[in-house]
Regions:
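PAPS-dependent sulfotransferases, especially Golgi type II membrane carbohydrate sulfotransferases
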Residues: 1-37, 206-270
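PAPS-dependent sulfotransferase catalytic core
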Residues: 1-99
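Short, well-ordered coil loops that connect the C-terminus of an alpha-helix to the N-terminus
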Residues: 57, 61, 134, 208-209, ...
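A short, structured active-site edge motif that brings together acidic residues
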Residues: 66-72, 140-145, 215-217
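Short secondary-structure boundary/hinge segments and terminal tails
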Residues: 72-74, 194, 219-222
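Anion-recognition interface
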Residues: 77-83, 87-94, 117, 122-128, ...
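Conserved alpha-helical scaffold flanking the Walker A/P-loop in AAA+ ATPase domains
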Residues: 101-105
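PAPS-dependent sulfotransferase catalytic domain
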Residues: 109-212, 231
Length: 270
């Protein structure tokens, strides 16, 4: 299966090849042992790319993919295994030992903390834990109305599909929050509106992270600009983009799951 045919993708392939080449020597001769593995558990369109960029300001952390939306599942050797292989189907099982071996070639093993952000991992925590030791999970959710708007706009999805998808994500995250001991959960709203407090929570959760800088301008993709911007809560603007008809269709599903929304601090919007 062809991954891409664009010029940009071929440039990315050159970058990845050069990165693996340099990592081979630095990891082989200077790499640390006993790494800590940090997995961002976040549904799509919930601010996970922004969170990834913030955490990547730490001098003690390495992200396995610095391009695009920064997801480990999009690296060339694993894209067909993960991204193109029914990522949201829980009955599909990935070869995690092989995936880890590939990711280790991209991580800077001179860093103590090795981080991945792959959205579909919210449904694969149990499998991940079987392969990775010293593991930490940093979970995040976002107002589901804002997430639904992103799914509709970016994926050209129907409100019905987007609403059901968002609810399924919340169900998975509720399970992860309740059953994963070594985990910390935050919300997109907390990250944007009280970033200093969230940064302190994260550093208390994994002290080896050291200092992180949330005051920079970040290039996480959003509907306002493809350029860099300061952290800003975009929920209100996104939710206002939903039409009255779309909102009614969304609420036909959300009204049946009020308790689930309330669990994460969200409520019905009419």
């Amino acid at each position: 299966m062809k991954l891409h045919t664009s010029k940009r993708w071929y440039l990315h392939l050159v970058y990845y090849k050069l990165l693996r080449f340099t990592r081979f020597f630095t990891n082989r001769f200077l790499g640390k042992k006993d790494h800590k593995f940090l997995f961002i558990l976040s549904p799509p369109y919930c601010g996970s790319t922004l969170l990834n960029q913030i955490l990547s300001t730490s001098g003690n952390l390495s992200c396995n993919n610095h391009l695009g939306v920064r997801e480990g599942q999009l690296l060339p050797e694993v894209k067909d295994i993960m991204f193109n292989n029914k990522g949201w189907h829980s009955e599909v099982h990935y070869p995690w030992i092989k995936i880890k071996k590939i990711w280790m070639k991209y991580w800077d093993q001179r860093k103590l903390i090795l981080m991945d952000k792959t959205n579909t991992n919210i449904i694969r925590v149990t499998e991940i834990k079987k392969v990775f030791d010293n593991i930490y999970f940093l979970g995040m959710v976002r107002n589901p109305y804002a997430q639904v708007e992103g799914i509709i706009r970016r994926n050209n999805s129907t409100p019905e599909y987007a609403a059901q998808f968002a609810l399924n994500c919340l169900r998975y995250q509720k399970k992860n929050k309740e059953f994963e001991v070594n985990s910390l959960f935050i919300t997109y709203e907390e990250l944007c509106d009280n970033k200093g407090n969230v940064a302190d929570k994260i550093k208390a959760f994994i002290p080896e992270l050291g200092d992180i800088d949330s005051d920079l301008e970040f290039s996480a993709h959003n509907f306002k600009t493809d350029g860099k911007m300061k952290i800003q809560n975009l929920n209100d603007e996104k939710i206002k983009k939903l039409s009255t008809n779309q909102l009614a269709l969304i609420n036909s599903y959300f009204n049946k799951e009020v308790e689930l929304l309330n669990y994460f601090g969200y409520s019905i919007i009419n």
